[in-house]
């Protein structure tokens, strides 16, 4: 009888511990990584948690999660440069499946630190991985998580998202010609009101006011695209309308940085339609024919 009581008491204790972990979204166990998550989520001591994540990484305990969680926490603590160094130094310890997620964190860190050129290169690298069929482990969709909820991301949506980020980065570099080309292709894959506004900004910066006005009315004001009901978006639309004045298009070179679009940018904006079709075929090749044609021209056309 005593053994049964002890057993039931143990079950109640285990059940209580499990419920505690669920409430605080903690992993089970007592490893260095689990202790780091407890300090981060329960004790809310970010600096102590970062030290414990370091210990977990050095102990090879759940390195995939430990490195990513530590980098994100460092970003919150305004230690983004340290987070970049950590990912670059220890990502080789992580699994192949974790590399895509680490790239996403690294892109945000580059953006926060103003390292735009490195952000551009990594975004183009991610696009190239998609073209090669290396993203999503060769599948047309992947499962993502946001605010504790899981959802499916299609390769088209991911490609459009990356192109949008690449267009924004080109805008920060004042390369509005490349940004325009990237945003146009992103809009063909998955139309979005915010990207349409960014495209209008690129056109205005190049003096293409009539075309910008046309896109603004056609793709934002007259269409019910994703994001079109956002009050912040409508405020931005009003700003764009105030910039648009009836005048002839000016020469792009007089208002934009002079830089021909190189082969890497061509690889970004060409062949995406064929690429999307390839994902819908059951037996696609690893590389699209268009990229076989582009590769020999890389040295000749590089910016």
Curated annotation (Swiss-Prot):
Leader sequence segment: none
Biological process according to GO: cellular response to sulfur starvation; chloroplast organization; regulation of glucosinolate biosynthetic process
UniProt subcellular location: Nucleus
Any Pfam family hit: TPR_8
Regulation: induction: Induced in response to sulfur deprivation.
SMART domains tied to this protein: TPR (SM00028)
PROSITE patterns documented for this protein: TPR, TPR_REGION
First and last residues of every TPR repeat: 64-97, 100-133, 160-193, 195-226
One Gene Ontology term, aspect cellular component: nucleus
Coiled coil spans: 62-89, 232-253
InterPro entries in UniProt: MS5/SDI1, TPR-like_helical_dom_sf, TPR_rpt
Key words of the record: Coiled coil, Nucleus, Repeat, TPR repeat
Family of this protein: Belongs to the MS5 protein family.
Function statement: Involved in the utilization of stored sulfate under sulfur-deficient conditions.
Name the record gives this protein: Protein SULFUR DEFICIENCY-INDUCED 2
The species this protein was found in: Arabidopsis thaliana
Taxonomic classification: Eukaryota, Viridiplantae, Streptophyta, Embryophyta, Tracheophyta
């Amino acid at each position: 009888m005593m053994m049964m009581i002890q057993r039931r008491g143990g079950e109640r204790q285990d059940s209580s511990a499990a419920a505690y972990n669920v409430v605080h979204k903690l992993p089970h166990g007592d490893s260095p990584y689990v202790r780091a998550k407890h300090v981060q989520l329960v004790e809310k001591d970010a600096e102590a948690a970062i030290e414990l994540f370091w210990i977990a990484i050095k102990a090879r305990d759940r390195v995939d999660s430990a490195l990513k969680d530590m980098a994100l926490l460092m970003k919150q603590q305004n230690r983004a440069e340290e987070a970049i160094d950590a990912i670059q130094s220890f990502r080789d310890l992580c699994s192949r499946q974790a590399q895509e997620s680490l790239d996403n964190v690294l892109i945000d860190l580059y953006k926060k630190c103003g390292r735009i050129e490195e952000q551009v290169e990594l975004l183009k690298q991610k696009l190239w991985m998609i073209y090669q069929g290396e993203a999503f482990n060769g599948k047309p969709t992947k499962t993502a998580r946001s605010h504790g909820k899981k959802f499916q991301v299609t390769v088209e949506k991911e490609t459009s998202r990356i192109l949008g980020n690449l267009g924004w980065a080109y805008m920060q570099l004042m390369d509005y010609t490349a940004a325009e080309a990237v945003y146009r292709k992103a809009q063909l894959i998955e139309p979005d009101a915010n990207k349409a506004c960014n495209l209008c900004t690129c056109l205005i910066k190049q003096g293409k006011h009539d075309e910008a006005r046309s896109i603004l009315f056609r793709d934002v004001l007259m269409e019910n695209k994703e994001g079109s009901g956002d009050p912040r978006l409508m405020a931005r639309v009003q700003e764009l309308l105030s910039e648009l004045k009836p005048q002839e298009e000016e020469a792009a070179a007089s208002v934009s940085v002079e830089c021909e679009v190189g082969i890497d940018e061509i690889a970004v904006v060409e062949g995406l339609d064929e690429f999307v079709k390839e994902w819908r075929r059951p037996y696609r090749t690893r590389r699209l024919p268009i990229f076989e044609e582009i590769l020999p021209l890389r040295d000749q056309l590089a910016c």
